[in-house]
């Protein structure tokens, strides 16, 4: 007598939490790309043809290697159409300096798509932000090229000598000496005014300079409910509080935290990188814990670490902690009673 076989279930129900959104993946990706348009336009305005070159190299590289990775891994679905590869390439480009050689930008696109996403099984299965994986590998492989910053075209014409092409970022200048904020500090005169820092008229990565463009795009995503406001707000607030306390203890002016908020990749990281749907926590409380952790790590690296920028590595480190946050900070299941 043959054993009775159970029929295959018609519906498979995965473990909670369950989330639903009226937007498709491709439409969501297009919305994020649209939100990045102001930052892209600002980068082209300040860095001209080099900005276009780096963006094109990164986006095309991401698309090509997405196609190749799918073929190698036997993925039949054409994931190029969902826009995730193009978005990864664009985000990567906005985290790179305008002077980066084209072949390095192409390699960055490959690293982001293949190592950051494909080897984990594709979109939705990656544990790290793909664009920051690409940036981190490029920084480790080509540190000199990744830390060579071009002065914006709006300033280059009025600058002579070697400084007309390269310059230190405000974060690097602040780290030159502990006395930079004190009267007569050796590097104090090299710091750009806050107005230049705010509008992006400084050296830096393509999309890390113009604060209004990034905030505008971020607010658009919050309005469209594509990202949760808690992550950027608590991330930025944590950095502001920690750098403010540190500045007060060290006797620095009250503008010290503003320099940290406006400089480097904090704005693009807070609105576009840390809010990645796949690599950030699901619950509201989890997002707050995640964002505060990002702020703590970013401030620690910037203030006391050997590297002047801490956004990229902070996000990658908190990406690793995200599964643990989701595990211990969960919503109570319907009908499951109170959480113990």
Locate predicted features.
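N-terminal signal-anchor module of multipass membrane proteins
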Residues: 1-63, 338
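Alpha-helical transmembrane segments in multi-pass membrane proteins
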Residues: 31-39, 54-66, 84-89, 93, ...
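Structural signature of hydrophobic alpha-helical transmembrane segments
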Residues: 49-61, 99-108, 197, 201-211, ...
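C-terminal ends of transmembrane helices
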Residues: 64-76, 113-125, 216-225, 271-280
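Membrane-interface helix-loop-helix junctions at boundaries between adjacent transmembrane segments
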Residues: 91-96, 100-160
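Loop-to-transmembrane alpha-helix initiation sites
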Residues: 127-132, 257-264, 287, 305-318
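Long hydrophobic alpha-helical segments that form multi-pass transmembrane helix bundles
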Residues: 130-215
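A beta-strand-loop signature enriched in Asp, Gly, Thr, and Trp
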Residues: 232-234, 241-284
């Amino acid at each position: 007598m043959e054993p009775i076989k159970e029929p295959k279930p018609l519906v498979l129900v995965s473990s909670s939490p369950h989330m639903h959104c009226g937007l498709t993946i491709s439409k969501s990706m297009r919305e994020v790309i649209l939100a990045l348009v102001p930052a892209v336009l600002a980068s082209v305005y300040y860095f001209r043809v080099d900005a276009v070159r780096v963006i094109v190299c990164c986006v095309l590289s991401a698309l090509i290697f997405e196609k190749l990775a799918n073929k190698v891994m036997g993925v039949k679905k054409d994931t190029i159409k969902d826009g995730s590869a193009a978005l990864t390439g664009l985000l990567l480009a906005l985290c790179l300096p305008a002077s980066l050689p084209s072949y390095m930008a192409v390699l960055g696109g490959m690293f982001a798509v293949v190592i950051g996403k494909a080897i984990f099984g594709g979109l939705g299965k990656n544990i790290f932000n793909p664009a920051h994986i690409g940036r981190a590998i490029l920084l480790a492989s080509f540190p000199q090229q990744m830390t060579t910053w071009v002065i914006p075209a709006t300033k280059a014409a009025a600058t002579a000598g070697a400084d007309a092409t390269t310059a230190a970022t405000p974060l690097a200048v602040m780290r030159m000496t502990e006395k930079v904020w004190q009267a007569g500090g050796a590097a104090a005169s090299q710091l750009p005014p806050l107005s230049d820092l705010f509008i992006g008229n400084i050296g830096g990565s393509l999309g890390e300079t113009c604060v209004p463009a990034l905030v505008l795009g971020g607010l658009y995503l919050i309005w469209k409910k594509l990202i949760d406001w808690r992550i950027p707000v608590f991330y930025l607030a944590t950095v502001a509080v920690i750098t403010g306390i540190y500045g007060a203890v060290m006797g620095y002016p009250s503008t010290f935290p503003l320099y940290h908020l406006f400089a480097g990749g904090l704005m693009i990281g807070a609105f576009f990188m840390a809010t990645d749907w796949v690599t950030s926590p699901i619950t509201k409380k989890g997002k707050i814990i995640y964002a505060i952790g990002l702020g703590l790590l970013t401030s620690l690296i910037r203030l006391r670490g050997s590297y002047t920028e801490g956004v990229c590595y902070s996000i990658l480190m908190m990406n690793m902690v995200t599964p643990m946050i989701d595990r211990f900070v969960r919503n109570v299941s319907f009908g499951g009673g109170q959480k113990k």
